[in-house]
């Protein structure tokens, strides 16, 4: 039996503390969209440059790579579980770098997903390359794929066009890395910016849709989902980050904080029904089974 670590009062944000390999098989529910930020397998004792300091890039044991075969099997296992949790017209977004994204694309194809786009996130403020022996790493990739090759997926074309000054949105997104204001409650070592998740959610979901994140971290996906008027389930194995997710969600119950976030996220200005309160008038059915 699944017992949520935290569920918001209006039930639009749920965190389950556990390993997604154990949690996902335990319930029957279909999601409209999945966002996944799986391990990049790049914690190898290297160094980087952040906020004017040289820092170790090791994120934790969960990010240490194994053999190519073990990484491929890891990706096959979680992507298979996620496919079972998607509606037939649902889509999945997966972020990565060259360390893992090619393995993921290979597995997606073998499992029957249809890859729609590979988004290049071009960071407007990347850290410098301190070795000066190759180009600065300034991009990450996000694969967008749908579950079924022949079932039409959801894409909010006109909204994306409006956000892009009336022109078709391209597959290169120039967005900053995470800002200090996004770490007000604490931080996760691989935390994604709200601007990135907001655009992903607005592109491929509708109001009140359900979004799953099997590697939730500090639940940036969930915060962005709620700011966009969507509902969220996150699965996170580290208790410290499940706790951080709870604090972050409770923070946006404060009207002034929510309004500040909305004002900072440019894409939200184009949302027809902007949810400036976290308290809906009614619950919208199709709730999680726990």
Say what each PLM segment does.
Residues 110, 136, 228-229, 252-254, ...:
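Short alpha-helix boundary/capping motifs
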């Amino acid at each position: 039996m699944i017992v949520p670590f935290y569920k918001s009062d209006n039930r639009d944000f749920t965190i389950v503390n556990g390993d997604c390999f154990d949690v996902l098989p335990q319930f029957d529910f279909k999601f409209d969209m999945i966002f996944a930020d799986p391990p990049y397998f790049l914690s190898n004792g290297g160094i980087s440059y952040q906020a004017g300091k040289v820092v170790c890039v090791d994120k934790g044991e969960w990010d240490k790579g194994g053999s190519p075969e073990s990484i491929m099997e890891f990706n096959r296992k979680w992507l298979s579980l996620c496919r079972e949790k998607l509606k037939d017209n649902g889509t999945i977004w997966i972020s990565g770098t060259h360390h893992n994204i090619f393995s993921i694309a290979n597995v997606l194809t073998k499992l029957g997903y249809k890859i729609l786009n590979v988004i290049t996130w071009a960071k407007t403020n990347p850290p410098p390359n301190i070795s000066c022996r190759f180009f600065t790493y300034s991009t990450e990739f996000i694969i967008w794929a749908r579950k079924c090759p022949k079932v039409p997926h959801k894409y909010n074309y006109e909204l994306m066009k409006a956000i892009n000054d009336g022109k078709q949105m391209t597959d290169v997104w120039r967005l900053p890395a995470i800002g200090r204001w996004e770490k007000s409650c604490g931080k996760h070592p691989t935390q994604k910016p709200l601007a990135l998740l907001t655009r992903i959610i607005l592109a491929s979901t509708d109001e009140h849709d359900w979004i799953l994140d099997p590697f939730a971290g500090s639940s940036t996906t969930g915060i962005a989902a709620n700011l966009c008027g969507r509902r969220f389930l996150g699965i996170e194995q580290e208790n410290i980050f499940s706790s951080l997710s709870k604090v972050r969600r409770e923070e946006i119950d404060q009207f002034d904080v929510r309004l500040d976030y909305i004002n900072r996220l440019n894409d939200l200005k184009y949302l027809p029904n902007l949810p400036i309160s976290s308290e809906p008038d009614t619950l919208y059915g199709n709730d999680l089974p726990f």
